[in-house]
């Protein structure tokens, strides 16, 4: 299975992402918009691993969230990887209870390392991918200003009450995300 651990964005928050994506696609028609049913905030991409690892991954998540109560993050700014001027990915960064998010991420990272699984060592930037580009795309200063204007809407906070283990399944040139387990945070 191809595993990843993420925060699923609640359905009540999705219309605001859809609004941003619609405006984004108008500004940059060649952008490949992320399907709303795939909108999430990844905490760890684990990749292809044996199916029997599932129970150990669930245990890692349970340990990482132990004692952590529900919290909120709010979409706040737009950026890109590797950078906003030549993005392969456009994403929305979040603000709010980032300390809790980072604490969970570190717990997951420690658990993955204890199983000798590869862990992304780059600085963790909590983000929600909204679009991708197939080719090298350049964003000039004018377009950058237009993208920043997309974020002037007042986003509703996203209530984080659980962490999910997903599998990513190739399907007709895309990947379908199936939820394998949901681990609730403390109420």
Task: Tell me what each language-model feature is.
Residues 1-187:
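Histidine-dependent nucleotide/RNA phosphoesterase domain, centered on the 2H-phosphoesterase fold
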